[in-house]
């Protein structure tokens, strides 16, 4: 009597899959109906256990004339997933793929979501790996990345995650760096900043190195979390990395991070460093540093940069005007505050930067 065993693991990358679009043959000697209702009945009545059922349906294609559809297989995998038998669902998917039977991507996504909800790290990594290489699929949605990240929320053990990411890094996937960057963002969205830093550190040792987008994304994540020391550490590492170059987005991100953390003293330091590197400040740069200097009480320097900004024909926003006016009032210079207020009133709205200008700057930098 043949022993049932799960088929060998398929190669993760480089393999090709032949999809059977509609129907598959089932052994003729099976006396029971090969419809999903028959399978459902067997599972619910206990006449056969799930292992025996898997043995029969996976070997259906060898001979026979009865027919079973992909819908039946899909429903069976979905039932396993709903019932919490996630390992059974995954094993069945693997077995079907070995038979060149590829189910819809939604089946994999649902299994990934269930694994993430149960914090099943090992299964989440396995399913995510399979979803990445499914033939003819659209780019993965944000939910797929978030569900992977959710599996690791309650643990510091990153063994399975590191193994998955290293495998992706060493793969031949043409979009592997995009995948790595989106994984980093997903872990940030789930507030796992320690794992974000871990991934960045590991990437520097792997084949798929972090690029400027990776670094800038991590800096933005750290800035939102108010982690000043970590921001400075990543910026220092980035400047030491010969494969990337800091740019205006890098410095604007750091400036905003320092401003949000109320480290106004560091804003002028970062601004001066940016200028010394030959990077010209833009609307976002001036807005961040002028606001920071004003809030720290450095009125003289904030007014100097405000004048420099206008000389370079960069239109200030209403926000910058109001920040400076407020700063002047707090310093007791009410006359200068009144003069600046009058200047704002006499300035056409066309000569002021609006929300669309900030968005335009962000879009141009991302390109």
From Swiss-Prot:
PPR repeat segments: 69-103, 104-139, 141-175, 176-210, 211-241, 247-281, 282-316, 317-347
Keywords: Repeat
Coiled-coil boundaries: none
InterPro entries: Pentatricopeptide_rpt (IPR002885), TPR-like_helical_dom_sf (IPR011990)
Matching Pfam families: PPR, PPR_2
Family according to the record: Belongs to the PPR family. P subfamily.
Protein name stated in the entry: Pentatricopeptide repeat-containing protein At1g11900
């Amino acid at each position: 009597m043949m022993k049932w065993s799960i088929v060998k693991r398929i190669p993760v990358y480089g393999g090709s899959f032949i999809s059977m679009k509609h129907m598959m043959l089932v052994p003729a000697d099976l006396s029971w109906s090969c419809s999903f209702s028959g399978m459902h009945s067997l599972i619910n009545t206990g006449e056969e256990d799930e292992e025996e059922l898997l043995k029969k349906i996976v070997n259906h294609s060898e001979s026979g004339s009865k027919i079973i559809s992909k819908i039946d297989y899909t429903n069976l995998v979905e039932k396993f997933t709903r019932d919490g038998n996630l390992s059974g669902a995954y094993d069945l998917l693997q077995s079907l793929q070995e038979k060149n039977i590829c189910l819809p991507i939604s089946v994999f996504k649902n299994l990934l979501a269930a694994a993430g909800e149960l914090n099943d790290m090992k299964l989440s990594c396995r399913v995510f790996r399979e979803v990445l290489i499914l033939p003819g699929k659209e780019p993965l949605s944000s939910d797929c990345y978030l569900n992977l990240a959710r599996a690791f929320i309650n643990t510091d053990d990153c063994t399975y995650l590191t193994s998955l990411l290293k495998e992706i890094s060493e793969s031949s996937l043409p979009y592997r760096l995009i995948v790595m960057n989106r994984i980093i963002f997903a872990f940030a969205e789930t507030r796992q900043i320690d794992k974000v830093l871990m991934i960045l550190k590991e990437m520097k040792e792997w084949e798929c190195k972090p690029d400027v987008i990776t670094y800038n994304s991590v800096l933005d994540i750290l800035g939102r979390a108010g982690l000043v020391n970590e921001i400075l550490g990543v910026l220092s590492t980035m400047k030491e990395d010969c494969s990337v170059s800091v740019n205006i987005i890098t410095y604007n991100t750091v400036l905003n991070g320092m401003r949000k953390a109320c480290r106004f003293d560091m804003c002028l330091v970062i601004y001066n460093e940016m200028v010394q590197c030959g990077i010209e400040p833009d609307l976002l740069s001036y807005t961040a540093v002028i606001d920071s200097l004003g809030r720290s009480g450095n009125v003289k320097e904030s007014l100097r940069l405000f004048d420099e900004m206008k000389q370079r024909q960069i239109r200030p926003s209403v926000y910058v005007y109001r920040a400076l006016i407020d700063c002047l009032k707090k310093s007791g210079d009410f006359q200068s505050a009144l003069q600046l207020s009058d200047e704002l009133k006499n300035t056409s709205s066309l000569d002021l930067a609006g929300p669309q200008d900030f968005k335009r700057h962000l879009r141009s930098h991302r390109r």
